[in-house]
Amino acid sequence: MAEQDFVEEVLRFLTARMQIEAEWAVQEQTSFTWWAHTLAQRVWVAPAREFQGVALRTLHIETDLLTGVPMTTSTWARLASMNRFATLSAYVAETKAGAVRLHSSVSLTADNFLLARTIALHAMALQMADAFAESAELAEALGGRVDATPHPRQGLRERPDEMVGILEIYEQRGEGDSPFDADEIAGLVHLEPRPWRLASNDVLQLAADLDFADDMPARLELDAAARHTALGSGLQMRLLLPLEPDDLIAQKLNANESLEPDAHQLGAWCVDGERGLMFTGFIPAAAYMPGLSRALVYHLSAKNEWARALLFPAG
């Protein structure tokens, strides 16, 4: 399929599956904005570029949360802590605008767009539902105000779309065991080409060392035994960097990845008291697809290279 064709197909797919009403949307050729309630959600496809010899289009998903947030060290610390519980999006501060938004992205290619569009759909749905549920409480915690905006023709949407209640479906699907089973996790150890120095697996868990610094590898972890506090079963993914924990670096990584990532951004950079500076995300059971865990391993490996180049450009 031609590049422009699959971009248009992905946007049509997301619009249809999210059941977006035309009257509450603004459509453009490679983007759309819609209002499920008072918070705008934007979906757009960035211009084409080449990455490792492959033509790539990045599909971004972003939902407004707060405006008027003071950009202080306290804000960085709160965001770095909040992002420890990320599912498929990051809380990202836009410093010049004093705004906090939810953001995620997927990398689209002619070979992967069918899988990528589906995980993008889940990121879009969870983002929209989380924004609806959390915005008022976050405004109080971070000192800003809810970034409610009107549709340019319809005005402010007073009655929320039924889709804002979609979290219940994810919660129900997460009541059972993870669909990422032991055989699937064990099989990842034998991936070729190998993206790591060394990898091992336990029941439902994978751990691998990735090149980062000469004697300090980064750590990739997948854990299908982990359960999300709200969504239940699925797959926890982590990328731990061998660096001192720093709230501002976590914000820098999230902000830069929201501009031009080299891999799927399905989660967030954060600071954890035990694990330090890391990227984390959670794939809920309802988002399971064959081949997804394999793709995530390679995207986490690419994310590691991207972070190393950003933080140590001369290295």
Language-model segments: residues:
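Hydrophobic-cavity lipid-handling domains and compact docking modules
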Residues: E28-T30, W34-G68, L204-L240
